[in-house]
Regions:
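Basic, glycine-rich polyanion-binding accessory segments appended to enzymes
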Residues: 256-263, 281-328
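Glycine- and acidic-residue-biased ligand/ion/polar-headgroup-sensing regions
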Residues: 117-119, 142-143, 147-165, 169, ...
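Ligand-binding loop in jelly-roll beta-barrel domains
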Residues: 107, 115-120, 139, 150-153, ...
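Loop-centered beta-sheet repeat module
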Residues: 174-220
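Intrinsically disordered, low-complexity terminal tails and inter-domain linkers enriched
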Residues: 52-82, 260-285, 334-362
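Transition-metal
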Residues: 1-164, 224-264, 268, 299, ...
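Active-site pocket scaffolds in enzymes
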Residues: 322, 333, 364-367, 371-375, ...
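Short acidic-glycine-tyrosine-enriched beta hairpin
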Residues: 182-193, 360-377
């Protein structure tokens, strides 16, 4: 099985910073760099994907101590979108790579970003599918955030403090007092927020996070602090549409607690009401937690300590996306034996193994890099030290609701 390296589409917005370039190794000709779309088949920011020529790992990829070395890389260096082929075109030619769960969608359902908010983003809301399809001819947007870094005192806005009428909200916008209606949430690295369509929200200044979202770029901007772009123009607001789609009810205490979490749990323990994946662990110092799930994505967060080893299954049901949040490691993917016939003509599967007869790929991975494993029967493993985000599709819809 070939491992695909994703080269992100880079977005330059007025609120962006330099951390994605300086700390996460994202290559971009423009600064400030606000967003890196590290898994995207969207027309507004199509990532690119490249594969190794021989699906082999260079000699000397691991030292005698078992730690990863950059000598084992077989991809082109750099993360510019000039590398590889269009991810959207790749999926068009290989629709099976998404997996059987993806057949429910007319498009690749998931989009993943790294976001560096040096300045605050606008306060905004996203419509659901029903409204977006009827009014915009495109899909809505549900998303989740995983906070990676924050400056001292950094916060975000997330839902309303109490129930408000449309008139009260409209008046607050006109009087430039809209932020006072919202829940102001102080953040710490590791916090997770699940944001259903219709929830008013905004990333505050000094926050760097990963965003996993529905494959949509539809945003209704409600409030932008009166600021202007490089040409001296204020950015367009979408107040009327926003008022139609926003959930004006109070964000309940239950919901705030459920959507803001920290910590890590050993594999096998329950996390956020769902059991961990149940995949096998060969060594200690491995932690896995389910941090979010809906029909468009399921997300697990994996912690490896002291060069630990983790192994999981690959299936024909879903692709697997791996985003390195911190640290480094060696990623391996293998396919199973092919089906063979018994000499007497009856079909028979050989015992499932992962020997040299199957295709095997291996590569060194590090902070800020994104990888795509196509849907196929097999297994994958990761050995190293760090934090990793695993995204895939699952059959069960686990969106939390009040």
């Amino acid at each position: 099985m070939a491992i695909g390296k994703i080269h992100p589409a880079c977005k330059q917005y007025l609120w962006g910073g330099e951390k994605l370039i300086r700390e996460y190794g994202i290559s971009s000709p423009n600064t400030p760099l606000a967003e890196a779309w590290v898994l995207s088949a969207h027309s507004d920011g199509d990532s690119r994907i490249s594969f190794s020529d021989e699906a082999r790992f260079s000699e000397g990829a691991e030292s005698s101590e078992g730690t990863a070395s950059s000598e084992g890389r077989f991809f082109s260096e750099g993360d510019s979108c000039s590398h590889g082929e269009s991810f959207a075109e790749y999926l068009k030619c290989h629709p099976e790579a998404v997996g059987s769960f993806g057949k429910a969608f007319p498009f690749f359902p998931t989009l993943i970003k790294l976001i560096d908010a040096k300045k605050a983003l606008s306060i905004q809301v996203h419509p659901d599918d029903s409204f977006a399809l009827s009014r915009e001819g495109q899909y809505g947007k549900t998303e989740m955030w995983i906070v990676l870094e924050r400056e001292e005192g950094a916060f975000l806005y997330f839902g309303f403090q109490k129930d408000y009428t449309e008139e009260e909200i409209r008046r607050a916008i006109e009087e430039e007092n809209f932020p006072s209606l919202l829940c102001k949430v102080m953040v710490e690295p590791g916090d997770v927020f699940f944001i259903p369509a219709g929830t008013v929200h905004a990333i505050g200044a000094g926050i760097l996070l990963a965003e996993v979202q529905q494959n949509s770029n539809l945003t209704y901007r409600v409030y932008d602090y009166g600021r202007k772009d490089a040409q001296g123009n204020t950015r367009e607001l979408h107040v009327e549409k926003a008022l139609e789609v926003m959930n004006r009810k109070q964000l309940s205490a239950y919901r705030q607690e459920a959507f803001k979490k920290q910590g890590k749990k050993p594999v096998g323990e329950k996390a956020t009401g769902e059991s961990a994946t149940g995949e096998k662990v060969a060594e200690k110092n491995v932690y896995l937690e389910r941090i979010g799930s809906c029909e468009y994505f399921t997300v697990d967060r994996l912690f490896l300590e002291e060069n630990a080893f983790y192994s999981g299954k690959l299936t024909e049901e879903s692709f697997l996306s791996l985003l390195v949040l911190e640290g480094e490691g060696v990623l391996t993917a293998e396919t199973k034996h092919a089906k063979e016939n018994h000499p007497d003509g009856s079909p028979e599967y050989k015992e499932e193994t992962y020997s040299s007869k199957g295709q095997k790929s291996k590569c060194f991975v590090k902070k800020g890099e994104s990888y795509f494993l196509p849907a196929e029967e097999g297994q994958w493993s990761l050995k190293g030290t760090g934090k990793f985000l695993l995204t895939f599709l699952s059959e069960k819809d686990c969106v939390r609701k009040d």
